[in-house]
From Swiss-Prot:
Pfam families: MINDY-3_4_CD (PF13898). This is Ubiquitin carboxyl-terminal hydrolase MINDY-3. GO terms for cellular component: nuclear membrane; nucleoplasm. It catalyses: Thiol-dependent hydrolysis of ester, thioester, amide, peptide and isopeptide bonds formed by the C-terminal Gly of ubiquitin (a 76-residue protein attached to proteins as an intracellular targeting signal). Its main location: nucleus. SUPFAM superfamilies: EF-hand.
Amino acid sequence: MSELTKELMELVWGTKSSPGLSDTIFCRWTQGFVFSESEGSALEQFEGGPCAVIAPVQAFLLKKLLFSSEKSSWRDCSEEEQKELLCHTLCDILESACCDHSGSYCLVSWLRGKTTEETASISGSPAESSCQVEHSSALAVEELGFERFHALIQKRSFRSLPELKDAVLDQYSMWGNKFGVLLFLYSVLLTKGIENIKNEIEDASEPLIDPVYGHGSQSLINLLLTGHAVSNVWDGDRECSGMKLLGIHEQAAVGFLTLMEALRYCKVGSYLKSPKFPIWIVGSETHLTVFFAKDMALVAPEAPSEQARRVFQTYDPEDNGFIPDSLLEDVMKALDLVSDPEYINLMKNKLDPEGLGIILLGPFLQEFFPDQGSSGPESFTVYHYNGLKQSNYNEKVMYVEGTAVVMGFEDPMLQTDDTPIKRCLQTKWPYIELLWTTDRSPSLN
């Protein structure tokens, strides 16, 4: 086993994981990218864990399908269209992970020649044909196990995007086989570079996949969404006790919302909350799903008031709803507002008439950006994807369609049930109401 493979295993699974990393956890991650029989463009997830890779791939696949494809019927995909969609999506994610866009890409594959011999000896019977062995080896996870699988992988490098695209297409059958998700994950990690990832992760000793529960870390999700393996979801970097905590530095193509924000465990910044396309990964305590729409008006450019709210909140990292009055000048400069000392003092007195030494967000926005509501339509068609069969209506992996109504205020006449998905979406649209076409709300788990 090469030194690089050992480093990769340590980064993904942790140092103490190798001997016993529970083969159960490893087996949960050993699946390919497989399309649902009930929904031509939806990927299936067989067990808990690999949603950290499958959900981002699904989100980028939808971006390609809805906003770059000329298909009139986006829910019908032939096998050839599935192949093209998946391969283009994998290339897009690899391209965004490529450090400084250096043009150096990696693909990790399985040494099939060795695998044939290994599998034959493991199963105790000689291979009757290479095709048969290839099929059996793709299913032989339990026999291969964690250590042996990692002894059989190899890396190939490519210097240009066209070369990479050809190779990804050539290896299409590999992406669908039993190890496709892991091989793609390893390809992303080596394209990014192990050292680069360690420099971005807050705690490099924490593995990307939890060795006990098998869930992917936030760093892993962020890497696939943005190309950066940072551990936080806020905008920009922050300092805490002299330590620099890295966040998201630019608007993401695909967004991220989490139930953890509704439960007040974290706050997602606007770079993830307001992405370039109306597609969001939605996180619960244990699973990732995808919420999306086809209406680009949902991601219209930030209104000045929304930009002001975002900037104000960067100076209010604890989400108190106020800043010390000493920071008012910095906020006004960041927003290109008049910021000469005399005017600043005038504003301090106006916004803090009681002399408490704080500036509240509400009065600040009302003073400088009055009557500017949030942009975007009031009603729109939405869809939800969950890759787990057992979590879907009728146990079929299909998009659930619904109508979302977004008001600028609470309307008791429109109020719908309080569900986890609604609570999660309220972190983006506080007064959203949802009406689904199925008998029950889609599950986040």
